[in-house]
């Protein structure tokens, strides 16, 4: 029997990043989704194209050997597929992990003895997303068999990095995506079984440096460009980065996060400098045509405690280091309100208009009132509220 991977989420990241590399490593991919049109389209079309974009030009790959099931209407079939699969991956968004956990738990419980444990890897823009998914899965597992879980499933955190820009209107299943990618995954959880054979993955012993470097450089920089760009009326990230004041604001924020990364991890100043240079070049890429509203969407998640702004700024504040530029990013993110098609931006506007500055600061950022970052952020919230009212 050939290798089989279950991919929760048939969206652009699922099709254009995860499934691309699973396909290239010889896996049959079974997509699991809840959107009928996505499932129908995947089952009707026996192939789709992934076009990698770079300054050198474009390269198109054809993806085949996949199927799709609905976790909403075909749960028994999904459970059977998981019970006989080698790998489960997901790209559904951190807030959706708790909803996919019950069916994964049923699939793990249905695995026959003697099969090697299934590899579970969450591919989300969040720190330790697989740990979070595992927690939700364990809530739904047969409690009498929890002690045998390591024989049935192994869970590994990952750090993913690839920009998927706004897609052309009638792209269908085809995905346009940047050529650059990084997919780092912990190898230690697999122990004596060894990690699955996925050639695109960079297997590492310690993931935190990769996760923090990526989240606090790529995501911090990308979102800073989006929020400054939105406020300045720019259409794309490329247009935003072409304006000197925005370019400087992004660079300043990344200088601050770089100082944290260098002081905390075994990454040299020169290494991080080169990494920042690469990231700024990537997000400035004119060929990606990345719309600021897409990159800025979900501001409440992006302003949360462990995320790309508050996360590094809080650690810098704890160390007595500079975080002024990040406060500027936070201010612009707070101004991303009532954006069409983005529920979180509407909710953000509601919180800022209805709550006191102290209530809003705690609800949005999760900062403790005695934290050294709390007062500076409170002042930013007060400033944004005074302008909004």
From Swiss-Prot:
SUPFAM superfamilies: 6-phosphogluconate dehydrogenase C-terminal domain-like (SSF48179), NAD(P)-binding Rossmann-fold domains (SSF51735). NCBIfam families: PRK02318.2-5. Keywords: NAD, Oxidoreductase. PANTHER family: ALTRONATE OXIDOREDUCTASE-RELATED, MANNITOL-1-PHOSPHATE 5-DEHYDROGENASE. InterPro entries: 6-PGluconate_DH-like_C_sf, 6PGD_dom2, Mannitol_1_phos_5_DH, Mannitol_DH, Mannitol_DH_C, Mannitol_DH_N, NAD(P)-bd_dom_sf. It holds the Pfam family Mannitol_dh_C. GO terms for biological process: mannitol catabolic process. HAMAP family: Mannitol_dehydrog (MF_00196). It comes from the Eukaryota. It catalyses: D-mannitol 1-phosphate + NAD(+) = beta-D-fructose 6-phosphate + NADH + H(+). Belongs to the mannitol dehydrogenase family. GO terms for molecular function: mannitol-1-phosphate 5-dehydrogenase activity. The active site is at residue 214. Monomer. Catalyzes the NAD(H)-dependent interconversion of D-fructose 6-phosphate and D-mannitol 1-phosphate in the mannitol metabolic pathway. Its EC number is 1.1.1.17. This is Mannitol-1-phosphate 5-dehydrogenase. One of its GO terms (cellular component) is cytosol. Transmembrane segments: none annotated. It comes from Talaromyces marneffei (strain ATCC 18224 / CBS 334.59 / QM 7333).
């Amino acid at each position: 029997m050939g290798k089989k991977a279950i991919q929760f989420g048939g969206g652009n990241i699922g099709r254009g990043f995860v499934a691309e590399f699973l396909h290239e490593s010889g896996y049959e991919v079974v997509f699991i989704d809840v959107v009928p049109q996505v499932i129908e389209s995947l089952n009707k079309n026996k192939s789709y194209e992934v076009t990698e974009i770079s300054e050198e030009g474009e390269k198109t790959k054809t993806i085949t050997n996949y199927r799709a099931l609905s976790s909403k209407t075909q749960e028994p079939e999904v459970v059977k597929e998981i019970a006989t699969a080698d790998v489960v991956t997901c790209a559904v968004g951190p807030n959706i992990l708790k909803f996919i956990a019950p069916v994964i738990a049923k699939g793990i419980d249905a695995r026959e003895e003697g099969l090697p444990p299934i590899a579970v890897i969450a591919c989300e823009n969040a720190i330790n997303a697989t740990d979070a998914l595992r927690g939700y899965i364990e809530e739904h597992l047969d409690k009498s068999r929890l002690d045998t879980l390591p024989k049935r499933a192994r869970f590994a955190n990952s750090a993913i990095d690839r920009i998927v820009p706004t897609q052309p209107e009638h792209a269908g299943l085809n995905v346009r995506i940047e050529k650059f990618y990084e997919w780092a995954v912990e190898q230690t959880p697999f122990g004596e079984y060894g990690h699955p054979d996925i050639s695109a993955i960079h297997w590492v012993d310690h993931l935190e440096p990769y996760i923090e470097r990526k989240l606090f450089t790529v995501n911090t920089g990308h979102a800073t460009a989006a929020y400054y760009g939105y406020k300045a009326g720019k259409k794309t990230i490329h247009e935003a980065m072409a304006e000197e004041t925005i370019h400087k604001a992004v660079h300043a924020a990344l200088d601050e996060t770089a100082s944290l990364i260098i002081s905390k991890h075994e990454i040299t100043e020169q290494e991080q400098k080169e990494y920042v240079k690469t990231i700024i070049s990537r997000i400035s890429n004119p060929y990606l045509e990345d719309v600021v509203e897409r990159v800025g969407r979900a501001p409440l998640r992006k302003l949360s405690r462990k995320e790309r702004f508050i996360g590094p700024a809080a650690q810098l504040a704890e160390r007595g280091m500079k975080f002024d530029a990040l406060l500027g990013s936070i201010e612009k993110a707070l101004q991303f309100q009532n954006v069409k098609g983005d529920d979180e931006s509407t909710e953000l506007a509601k919180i800022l208009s209805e709550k006191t500055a102290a209530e809003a600061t705690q609800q949005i950022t999760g900062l403790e009132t005695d934290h050294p970052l709390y007062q500076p952020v409170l002042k930013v919230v007060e400033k944004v509220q005074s302008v909004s009212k």
